[in-house]
């Protein structure tokens, strides 16, 4: 979809996801996968949730109703007009998100949003709005269901395609993944075996010496 492509282009800057409840958790989840999967710094995509880290596990009363707190959190992280703010809210009416997006636009910062409600107040604050129509939830008002699933898919599309554009993927391989456990060391070793035709032991030694599949392959070919 052209609006997904536009948000993908926006995300080549440093980006902030903002949401409350399920929407906020999904933003934090997607942002947290960027360093281990693609080997990029954790500041490239930052997920902010109303109520802070406590709200990842437990509801924080009235946190999403604070229209000023979102922008305060962005300024605490030294946001600039070279960054992007993407609001996530099924209803498109979350004050925490809308307030942050409004102030971002006032400061010349590019904004986008993902919502399930057409013509929402949040979309009115977005330079690029993705409005996905998912229909009624199976349990009325429980937007963690169809809306949450749709949000997750769109976030995946945006960040994955951005990482491909930035050269952090080769083919369909995570060549810049962090080697944080034995499974990933084994996976990376097998990628090198496939790419360079080395035996497993040499490939593993090369991987551990250089720290990533891409660096190991590039170093071997110099």
Can you annotate each of these PLM segments?
Residues 162-222:
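Short, amphipathic alpha-helical interaction segments embedded in low-complexity terminal/linker regions
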Residues 16-153, 162-166:
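Glycine-rich phosphate-binding loops that contact phosphosugars or nucleotide phosphates
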Residues 1-8, 12:
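Single conserved hydrophobic/aromatic residue that forms the stacking wall/gate
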Residues 12, 63, 67, 94-97, ...:
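Generic structural signal for well-ordered, non-membrane alpha-helical segments
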Residues 6, 46, 71, 98, ...:
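Predominant activation on well-ordered alpha-helical scaffold segments within soluble catalytic domains
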């Amino acid at each position: 979809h052209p609006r997904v492509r536009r948000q993908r282009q926006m995300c080549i800057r440093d980006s902030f996801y903002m949401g409350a409840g399920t929407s906020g958790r999904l933003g934090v989840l997607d942002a947290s996968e960027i360093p281990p999967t693609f080997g990029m710094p954790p500041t490239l995509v930052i997920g902010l949730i109303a109520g802070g880290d406590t709200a990842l596990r437990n509801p924080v009363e009235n946190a999403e109703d604070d229209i000023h707190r979102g922008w305060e959190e962005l300024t605490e992280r030294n946001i600039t007009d070279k960054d992007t703010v993407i609001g996530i809210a099924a209803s498109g009416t979350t004050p925490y998100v809308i307030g942050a997006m409004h102030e971002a636009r006032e400061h010349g910062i590019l904004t986008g949003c993902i919502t399930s409600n057409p013509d929402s107040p949040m979309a009115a604050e977005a330079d690029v709005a993705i409005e996905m129509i998912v229909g009624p939830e199976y349990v009325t008002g429980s937007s963690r269901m169809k809306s949450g699933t749709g949000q997750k898919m769109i976030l995946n599309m945006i960040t994955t395609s951005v990482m491909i554009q930035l050269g952090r993927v080769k083919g369909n391989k995570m060549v810049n993944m962090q080697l944080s456990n034995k499974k990933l060391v084994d996976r990376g070793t097998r990628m090198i075996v496939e790419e360079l035709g080395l035996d497993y032991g040499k490939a593993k030694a090369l991987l551990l010496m250089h720290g990533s599949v891409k660096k190991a392959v590039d170093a071997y070919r110099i």
